[in-house]
């Protein structure tokens, strides 16, 4: 008899776990005993537990991206391998050079299978070792040059030089416009016709062709020419005052126009005062400024550094370059009472009745240009000499001088070694270091309508003596051809000038100032009070209560050291101050 088994199903129960309530934050309040005193360290299975010495790799690696793809796990020191030196196992190793067999004497033939020089498609001139490409020393050097860095400054480039503005901006000046160089470089005003002559003044001497045969082996000393150069601004020009009644509505000089047209190449700060009177613009330079001084190595990668009263400070180099240009432009002429001269219709307007001394050979050509939209520009341009051609016609010259001061400091080619054989390399170096100055000279020659632009190569007789110079050679160009060589676009130059004129024409009558920012590639237009820069008398400070600021923004005083001043006074041409200008 079988027993009946009754299976009564039991009811499933659920017991809720005991939860801890953390009043101070989140997470458990107590740590279980099983997990106490266990250190936590981020860990990844792909991490290496130690460092392996790779004796087949090269020491020259690309350190910049060494940690780009490295994992942050396993960064603790408990997993790293530390090698402890054991003095008992120390022994000397024979380091004598082993002569390789002939078939392994190539550059990378020791392990051609693993080391491949990257010269094919997609290669970058490196060496592939164990699947990792490392840059060679030459490739690293080329990379640094492309990035503009050097090892001298720790791969960060030289520290930026902070320059001061050419004039102190006062709080009551109102900024009207900021024009950055990339935007100005895109402007263009094509189809501007050749300037039309309104009046010609002055007397010119003829160029001495014997200076075309000067070379390094037949150098000539630069002589001191005691002549007066007039640097008259726009509103002080009696001819422009007369022409402003009948011709044009914008007035300037060739130097002022060239500064504005070539502003995108400039690094130093400069400023130009613009007066708007009755719908007419007068562009002026300020009195007692260094506007007329020539910059030296302004656009070089390492421009001259300020070093007190050193001969190679920016201000002293500018003074030296200016006097070299004055003396050179007069020495290469056929001067003398018996020598013929080329006279224009009117005499020099800046020679006063009580003026003592001989005036430099400079002729002035007053010209006008139609810039469309009712804008007519009237400007005073200059010629330096004339040249009689074999065909009988006369050509007008613009004469300038390039000066060498210290080729080692300037990182330039030494002229005495390369001028006769590699003149193109020297000129290319000058174009790189003095791009703004050469562009302004070219613009001035084009505005004046000069037939030739003649350059002289003048160097110091001794590197440490700025008082004696020698002429090493000359070179001439047609202004338009030279403009094409230096990538100077007159359409862009006219466009920059027209842009600034249009902005000023929209303003009310008053005084304005356009200034190149000393540390940024841009120019600013300010609305300034009418009495700014006015002076009660000669030698006094303006009503702003401060003396003029130097053009380059350095702290050098207006007077140089005693030896520099004495040296310059012995070799320089006489340059009168603004107070010596002839009155209208």
UniProtKB/Swiss-Prot annotation:
Q: Where is this region: RNA gate?
A: 290-304
Name of the protein in its database record:
Eukaryotic translation initiation factor 3 subunit D
InterPro entries noted in UniProt: eIF3d (IPR007783)
Question: What gene is this protein translated from?
Answer: eIF3-S7
- Provide the GO MF annotations for this entry: mRNA cap binding; translation initiation factor activity
Q: Which GO terms describe its biological process?
A: cap-dependent translational initiation; formation of cytoplasmic translation initiation complex; translational initiation
Residue ranges, compositional bias (Acidic residues): 533-546
Write down the species. Anopheles gambiae
Query: For bias kind Low complexity, which ranges apply?
Result: 563-575
- Main location class: cytoplasm
Q: Indicate where this protein resides in the cell.
A: Cytoplasm
Q: Which family does it belong to?
A: Belongs to the eIF-3 subunit D family.
What is this organism's lineage?
A: Eukaryota, Metazoa, Ecdysozoa, Arthropoda, Hexapoda
Q: What is known of its domains?
A: The RNA gate region regulates mRNA cap recognition to prevent promiscuous mRNA-binding before assembly of eif3d into the full eukaryotic translation initiation factor 3 (eIF-3) complex.
| The entry's keywords | Cytoplasm, Initiation factor, Protein biosynthesis, RNA-binding
Q: What does this protein do?
A: mRNA cap-binding component of the eukaryotic translation initiation factor 3 (eIF-3) complex, which is involved in protein synthesis of a specialized repertoire of mRNAs and, together with other initiation factors, stimulates binding of mRNA and methionyl-tRNAi to the 40S ribosome. The eIF-3 complex specifically targets and initiates translation of a subset of mRNAs involved in cell proliferation. In the eIF-3 complex, eif3d specifically recognizes and binds the 7-methylguanosine cap of a subset of mRNAs.
**Chain intervals for the UniProt region annotation (Disordered):** 100-165, 529-550, 563-584
- Compositionally biased residues, Basic residues: 100-122
- What GO terms fall under cellular component here? eukaryotic 43S preinitiation complex; eukaryotic 48S preinitiation complex; eukaryotic translation initiation factor 3 complex
Query: Quaternary form?
Result: Component of the eukaryotic translation initiation factor 3 (eIF-3) complex.
Specify one Pfam family.
eIF-3_zeta
């Amino acid at each position: 008899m079988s027993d009946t088994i009754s299976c009564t199903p039991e009811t499933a129960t659920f017991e809720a776990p005991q939860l801890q309530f953390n009043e101070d934050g989140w997470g458990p309040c107590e740590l279980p005993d099983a997990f106490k005193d266990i250190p936590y360290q981020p860990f990844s299975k792909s991490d290496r537990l130690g460092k392996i010495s790779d004796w087949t790799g090269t020491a020259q690696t690309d350190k910049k991206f060494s940690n780009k793809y490295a994992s942050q796990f396993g960064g603790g020191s408990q997993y790293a391998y530390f090698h402890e030196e054991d003095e008992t196992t120390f022994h000397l190793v024979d380091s004598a050079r082993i002569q390789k067999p002939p078939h392994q004497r190539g550059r990378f033939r020791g392990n051609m299978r693993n080391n491949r020089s990257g010269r094919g498609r997609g290669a970058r001139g490196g060496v592939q070792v164990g699947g990792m490409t490392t840059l060679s020393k030459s490739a690293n050097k080329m990379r640094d040059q492309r990035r503009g860095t050097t090892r001298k400054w720790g791969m960060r480039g030289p520290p930026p030089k902070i320059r001061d503005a050419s004039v102190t901006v006062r709080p009551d000046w109102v900024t009207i416009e900021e024009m950055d160089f990339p935007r100005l470089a895109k402007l263009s005003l094509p189809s501007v016709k050749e300037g039309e002559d309104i009046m010609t003044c002055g007397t010119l001497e003829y160029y001495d062709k014997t200076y075309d045969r000067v070379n390094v082996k037949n150098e000539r000393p630069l002589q001191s020419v005691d002549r007066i150069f007039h640097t008259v601004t726009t509103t002080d020009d009696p001819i422009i005052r007369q022409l402003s009644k009948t011709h044009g509505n914008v007035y300037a000089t060739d130097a002022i126009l060239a500064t504005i047209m070539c502003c995108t190449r400039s690094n130093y700060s400069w400023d130009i005062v613009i007066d708007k009177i009755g719908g007419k613009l007068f562009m002026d330079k300020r009195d007692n400024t260094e506007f007329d001084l020539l910059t030296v190595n302004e656009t070089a990668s390492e421009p001259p550094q300020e070093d007190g009263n050193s001969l190679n400070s920016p201000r002293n180099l500018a003074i030296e370059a200016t006097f070299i240009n004055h003396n050179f432009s007069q020495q290469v002429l056929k001067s003398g009472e018996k020598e013929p001269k080329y006279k224009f219709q009117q005499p020099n307007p800046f020679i006063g009745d009580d003026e003592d001394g001989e005036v430099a050979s400079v002729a002035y050509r007053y010209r006008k240009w139609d810039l469309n939209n009712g804008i007519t520009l009237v400007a005073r341009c200059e010629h330096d000499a004339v040249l009689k051609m074999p065909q009988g016609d006369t050509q007008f010259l613009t004469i300038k001088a390039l000066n060498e001061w210290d080729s080692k400091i300037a990182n330039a080619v030494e002229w005495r070694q390369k001028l006769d054989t590699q003149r193109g390399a020297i000129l290319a170096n000058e174009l790189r270091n003095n791009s703004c100055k050469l562009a302004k000279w070219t613009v001035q020659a084009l505005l004046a309508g000069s037939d030739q632009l003649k350059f002289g190569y003048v160097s110091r007789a001794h590197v440490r003596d700025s008082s004696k110079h020698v002429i090493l050679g000359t070179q001439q160009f047609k202004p338009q051809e030279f403009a094409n060589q230096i990538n100077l676009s007159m359409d862009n130059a006219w466009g920059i000038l027209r842009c600034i004129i249009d902005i000023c024409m929209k303003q009310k009558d008053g005084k304005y100032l356009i200034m190149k920012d000393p540390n940024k590639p841009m120019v600013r237009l300010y609305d300034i009070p009418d009495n700014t820069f006015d002076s009660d008398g000669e030698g006094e400070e303006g009503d702003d209560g401060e003396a003029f600021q130097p053009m380059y923004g350095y702290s050098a005083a207006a007077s140089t050291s005693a030896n520099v001043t004495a040296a310059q006074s012995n070799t320089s041409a006489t340059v009168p101050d603004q107070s010596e200008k002839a009155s209208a």
